[in-house]
């Protein structure tokens, strides 16, 4: 492959064997595409805002005299950009303006005659916008809307697994789930009657629904049963014979084919052989005894023709008496229902007998009573309720997905249809359910991903927006009906508040709108690709069973089987697989390569879980020859969710990649195939907790996925267009764009402003550093600047550490780690944490608070770090308790003593009226002030510091725009010069005059003069545009801020804290091998090898075998080989060997193994080879993709190239004694992460502090500055030791004896170390509780 200039700087050697047929899809597309569908105008009106508007509008008045129609909508421009919103603490959103048309009809004229039409654009609130990185900025904080995996609308058939009834009988049920509306359930009871429930209420016989749909008993029976006719001849019955229907019956008489030839004797069971013989004999009639018809059911009602009296109702059971009666009434043919024990049950027939209703009205009344118990039913109310349940599009919608699923399940040919149910739909559900009960068909697997779909941001926002619109609709309808429409405009009808409230509620406080996990780029990407089964309309932790949480065969390639949280949410929160995407219906799809007659093509099809089951799919590692044909006769395949062996000619599809089944986080684990799944799960989860280190270090052993994550996460600055870097400093990069990528009349310059030392949601540091230099060429997609945890455009979550697996004085007992002091000194795991501290000046009843440096009773030293406005300087180093922002609050006037009044009169001292309420640094925090932001209310005078900050921001904006303008000017003057030279002016004339006079020259040629004037006009327009741009920015910066009521000023101070690695910090590898640092040992005491190189970390070898994460050992060996190769290249560079030797060695390294990667070092220039070698000095970075990684043989080859022992084990010497250890030790390089569980955040001690109000016991937890609970078991321990006084102290003065503890505090101050324990407050609480039971206990204080 061809590498760009930037990519040639450092090439990661790839051990992957299988050819990559497709790039990884953009990792955030699930979020961005969904939201784009929501806000883009959809001409079909099926999705997004358009669909919401069309579903509610037009809104008609109750009288029909007017209606409000929807025309179109547009989203305005957001007021502030993303960064400004984050700084100001506001929502990044755009105003929604909707064009509405009010149509008033003429009451007097014919129906539909329009009297008046008014059209107007109406403001309908703000719609939060998604940033380019798939997040939302809500009230200044970045949030992510997690996609939800919910049960797809449609119809589902299931059974209770025999758990409902004591007999263990399996009871089948069907459930019609709409996208919105009432649920309709059908279920069998233990007696095999069919019942219906609406919205899980009381059950009714299922026939009631059919009666309510105007079906009679006869029609119902005709729909569900075939009939068998019997002709009465005297005292004999002749049956119309269909041989198939006799299967399984026991003959109660001899069945003969011909005279004397008995086929089935009486008492024998009729088998398939008998039926074949009957069919062969073509017997159409069979004489049966009268007993044979007894117990059968009539399919229709029979009437006595002479009297008109009903002899037998439809569904009546035939008895001998009834038979005689019917025969007597002259009925010669009786039609009975065909039923048998095996495949046609008597369920509907039995249900009709249970049903008390006989006509439509009775059925509707029953439904009404069930839905609205206690309300008296009327005919209209009952009919209205029933038709609104399933047959009104306003109340009920299956959605396109639901209709497609419904039709496919009940066997309808079409995939499309209406969103409401029809009579036929309800009948087909009942027929399918009865079929399943009869053994025809299977129940559904609700955990199959064909029955669960993804609801993403756009869809959820649309639903919420529709909820807001429905609230508005009611108000509009009432307003329209009030009359006086002549003076009313659409604006007067619409109140945007309910819409804004619904949208705000969803984005601000929905369970699926989550505070973004911003620890590092991986945690951001993973959070956006998360799929939750929880949330509104989903499952709850308590109700979810094992099946829902389990890995399902359909997860393959769609949902990661590894990455899920440990704990109560296991299996309910999942992560999208690398290549998965959602289709138009919201079902997850995964890509497959098409295979035709054993030949693997490059054609790629995306299949959903529903479609996949029908195909035979081979795995990505199936052996193929050079012509891409499958080699083996039998190939390992998946078919109908089972793993089987199939002939290569039968294979229809093949996986696109071995990494297809896992998520992004799991695909970052090298040698994943050698790790136990539980540990891989921990590894995936812990990578998300890694804190970005101060000095980034790319992993030596990676998987090739690092680059994809770093670029797609959006933390790096990526070139939008190709060009040449014309300017670089720490905070901005300017790229002069290639001419072929420029648009007509534009600047041809891209400015990238980098994010510097910004606080993330998790208080970690977001900082971008340029990786390009001036004059370097860039192509589109190149990384220009690294973000947090990225190194030259690759994800770098931790550091490559030299580790040894050996015990060391018990310091690595039970997963502890021993660390070398060198790691701390070199700042390898030093991290920066930024805290935001806020000081708010409010308007109080006693007067307004003031931010000032004039604080009462505070010494000069405490104010030394504040400026004259009372705000701390940037760059000041502060400790716990230091004042950051001086603030005074007025306090209520106290009654003064005469002496104080006199002093006040003499000295005029007023300072006593205010109290110090300054913002101070929290205890145990020490850091540097890196930024201050001041927000002042409109109309409040700005202080000197606020003005200074404003000036600085304006200067930056000016510089940006000035750079862009100067480059544009240069381009325009270059074009002008070319034109003037071609018009005959010479170069010396042009250089002697100022450039702005070039544009005012008079040229002889009219065409050239016109062109010059056009250039001059273009130049004036550009200047004007820039002035406008600057004015807009200036207004934004200088305008007052929109603060909450009562707030005058807000000062935000950003404090950077450096955290060095220390004992108690948690660290981990990528294989779930986590541990806590037990000790940091001087470097001279660490074990070292024969070259005197000490190890950085000593790990316990016993942590490996039982955990079965062998991947870490392979990573250690491979890391060592990579490091060895880097050292060899370093030696060659230092010895200044010939370039061809260096080139050959590097080529030899890249040629190791049978990988898909081709690196032609021969085609590199000498400078490029030297640059590459310089970047390989620290070690050769390699990629070993999951399930497709480096083999043992290849690792050994690298060891040989690096001149190292192939065992990967080395003889180490003890740094303390100087003696060699007995056995060689596994030493190598492992990528270690420092997790965001730092001892500084956990360590906490309390002497005195706040107490709980009722029990008066100290609070718990660091956040509340609480104490350590001395619990029940600790009390037992002291009791066991007989330490009575210690126990008394613990239970009284150190806990909730209020008087005792106050007295002890006084005594300690006085130097008196005695205590006087009293009655603990909890004892008083106990007394009060006993009194509440009516038992009085009094204490005698003798």
Swiss-Prot record:
GO term, biological process aspect, one: DNA-templated transcription
Keyword Flavoprotein: no
EC class of the enzyme, as a word: transferase
Catalysis performed (reactions): RNA(n) + a ribonucleoside 5'-triphosphate = RNA(n+1) + diphosphate
GO cellular component, one term: DNA-directed RNA polymerase complex
InterPro entries: DNA-dir_RNA_pol_bsu_ext_1_sf (IPR042107), DNA-dir_RNA_pol_bsu_external_1 (IPR019462), DNA-dir_RNA_pol_su2 (IPR015712), DNA-dir_RNAP_su2_dom (IPR007120), DNA-dir_RNAP_su2_hyb_sf (IPR037033), RNA_pol_bsu_bac (IPR010243), RNA_pol_bsu_CS (IPR007121), RNA_pol_bsu_protrusion (IPR007644)
Record GO terms (molecular function): DNA binding; DNA-directed RNA polymerase activity; ribonucleoside binding
Domain of life: Bacteria
The UniProt record lists the keyword Transcription: yes
Region forming the signal peptide: none
Its EC number(s): 2.7.7.6
Keywords noted in UniProt: DNA-directed RNA polymerase, Nucleotidyltransferase, Transcription, Transferase
Stated family: Belongs to the RNA polymerase beta chain family.
Description of how the protein assembles with itself and partners: The RNAP catalytic core consists of 2 alpha, 1 beta, 1 beta' and 1 omega subunit. When a sigma factor is associated with the core the holoenzyme is formed, which can initiate transcription.
Entry-linked HAMAP family: RNApol_bact_RpoB
Main function: DNA-dependent RNA polymerase catalyzes the transcription of DNA into RNA using the four ribonucleoside triphosphates as substrates.
Name of protein: DNA-directed RNA polymerase subunit beta
